[in-house]
């Protein structure tokens, strides 16, 4: 039986950070569910690193959320991915999401978080305290505020937890995550 992976996100998810993991997991024959605050078509955004001091944002593609957070029973899944973009800014406020994420850490299941996904993890300081991770550099203060150790690496693995800076790091991020899934 194929392993089941849950991706949690919402509108304004970074396009590459959802599409690359989604299709990479399907390619490996995993069963993948995308969940969001509401079951709907999600609007993605493209974050690019132009000649600015920060990233720029453009509209991206649409992608279906297969389920709402309220419909998710995390015990039915083997692993979790949290993409970045701006979605983490508001999905972390959904009362169901911290419970979902907590389950994966407490059950020691593989968890992957990229870029601004660390904003979701800020809702679980008791889980993150003492863990090491990386994230988009602008998220470093939030990572440190919850007691996690920010690591200046493009991709980092801390036991069952894989984290990465941003979409340019997706190949290593997914390689490490799939290694955890195949253990």
Predicted ranges, named:
Residues 1-107, 119-132, 140-183:
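Extended, subdomain-level signal for the structured scaffold at the beginning of enzyme domains
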Residues 114-117:
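Short, thiol/selenol-centered motifs that function as redox-active sites or metal-ligating centers
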